[in-house]
Amino acid sequence: MNDNKQFPVWEVSEIAERESWRKEVNRPIYHIHKWWAQRLGSVFRAVLLYLIEDSTENIWDSYYKVHDYNNITVLDPFMGSGTTIGEALKLGAKAVGCDINPISSFLVRQELARVSIDELSEAFNSLEKNVSPDILKCYQTIDDFSGELIPVLYYFWVKIVVTPDGEEIPLFSKYVFAQNAYASKKPKAQIICPECWKVFEGVYNQTNAVCPHCGKTFNPQNGPASKTTVRSTKGKIYKIKDLVPADGSLLKEKMYALLAVNKNGEKHYQSIKKYDVDLFQDICEQVRHSSTFSPSYNVRPGFNTDQARGYNYDTWRDFFNKRQLYCLGKLLDGIQNIKSQKIREQFLCLFSSTLEFNNMFCSYKGEGTGAVRPIFSNHILKPERTPLENSVWGYSCSSGCFSTLYKTRLLKAKQYLDNPFELYIDPKTKKCSKRIASRK
């Protein structure tokens, strides 16, 4: 390494900032699966060039060149998501990576594995034909307007505590459960009535509401739950943690709303009907007889896991409801039947990624953004009081589902392997474009 070289801090920072806005789009190869502390590929490309180049040439001048350092071997003994490995290979170098975490080893092998796009598409189409119909049947409801069966995108749930007096209290912090991410510009919101449990439309910040179904007057901003406590109808305050069942069972959960899409592609919220409850109960019965996906491993003690264990989440199976277990089991069965090991492992990696968005620790981010806030949105494992149940297979307008993650993550990552690009910012217009500047 030539010590007289200068690292192009400002140029790389500008590119890195753009990359960070949509990392899964701008460097899809490293985002087929969740990993913590992921590094930016543009930064690592520049760092590797700085370390490898012996000349005094400005590193930035060679950033967009196609390189062939086949006489160089890069070692990363703590490779994590594989950014160092991937960027080294793009520069034509040899790369060796390892990690103490087996997830890392599996993940990096899958993201760098070259597979036929045609074979990948064929396997996905087979899953869509043979597996998705059974899953999609589990996510449907009766349209309030047409009376027809229509797809459900998301179900809304709330945890319920039982006081020593036997009163059941839903853990709503407020009764506004859905609003736009830019609420000041689009103030329309969805409200659940605490009396009749019907859904109606209101405004995100309104403090006085009258339920059009039962006439109940209430403040949608004031739910019974506040931070670590809950208030009974008689005004008594309890610590939520003190109301966790002593027999080791989980808190009760109630399904209270859903978001469906009609045949015209229009989304609308609905209250829960008898049909929805019966459908869920039917699936619960089927789970008793068949579920390949049953992660019964114990949740081991730890700083974060103890937060879940404190609410009686003792096995990883507890993180999913029965419909999720049933549908994920169907999907896993289909994936395990894929004959090609290489293709099968690609879909197993995608299946694992799908779990992040399909469990009862997810929540609703709202409209105007990706709807599902996944389990690892924060580095904690505290149970979600108002969990969101996603549709496992999903639809074109879904967020965080198997079918959408296949198209937006796995497929994009494989296409990137064939055409690895770098972001380029025009110095005059500041417009961003893509440049092929790497070995395939």
List each language-model region with its residue ranges.
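Conserved SAM/SAH-binding loop
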Residues: S81
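Conserved glycine-centered beta->alpha loop in an early N-terminal alpha/beta scaffold
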Residues: F78
